[in-house]
């Protein structure tokens, strides 16, 4: 269903389905927005903009807070929908809802700190700074965090006075529609937030629509590159890209074998590796301790149970296509000279559930620098800490990196040298603070980080000099 002007309407475009990735059952059916409907959705957002933007921050915030109260009240329902539609285990789905609920306070603080008003009185003049909303912003959501990541754009955009067209992932329409239901119950004025299902054609149309002022996208580098090409014709529009990573986890100078293996395991395999910050590459010292860590990691992987849903550490990959691409990626690595430590395979009777892949890439003839969205870890051994840093940087991505070490003095040179936007010590690569920016460099984005800095691309500054005649 489409949602605009506070009304629900069936789409007139191509039909599509949401499929439970664990068992293959069809759990939702609907249609994309037609071109005519999409124009109506954008018009709805445009007509609502000035009325929303001219409300005081206090009034806008009161409605937004009501949405968060409703989300908290209905968090069990949201958790169930996320788990059903993405395949996440319930604890992982509940964690996403918790992360979304924590977004409000950080967004308000960021708005006031980074895009609020400011007055500086000097001897002969006053300098004034205000911020204005852009207008209609289109949020293109991902499947892996269908609530939390779109919400990371939507909340700061609404706070700043923008109106929203939300185009969710085709894999998670139920979560999107329930999110819209809660926003409607919160009492947002008609047209302030709108929902349009669709695929590439809908996204392309939103990019080119004259009334749409920006695209806030979370997803793969390949799609982000396509969006950049389209938006090159519209340099006056905002484009914020939150893309993927080929993230390294470096282990150096630690005797805590079990603790290191636990951090590596969670970094690589949480959410079946379907987080942009998951560790993709493990860089170990070429020592006895390095080999002990690898052996401990192998034991943890082999101990995983895939017998029943209640036993799962992680859920399935999002689709049959994703599963096929994951397994093909594994074969590509092996064809290039990588060696199997533990080979991933599909779990019988579980549709898109796969076992983890542990691959030694030491002898590869050519590095394959791509983000592989699944439970795979590529293992390398190095002789020096500088060699570990060099290998960590041997990627065109730059989202997340981690260092595990008993020697904390190594962290400062690691942070200074490693090209990534999120760098953690003795923590998972997937850990990030909502009070800081979230983003990377290179193929991981276009230097418009989300998180605390999302406020920056949701408003534009007006600087004034005020003098007396």
Model segments located where?
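ALDH superfamily catalytic-core signature
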Residues: 223-362, 425
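N-terminal Rossmann-like NAD(P)+-binding subdomain of aldehyde/semialdehyde dehydrogenases
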Residues: 1-125
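Conserved C-terminal structural/oligomerization subdomain of aldehyde/semialdehyde dehydrogenase
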Residues: 22-29, 212, 250, 346, ...
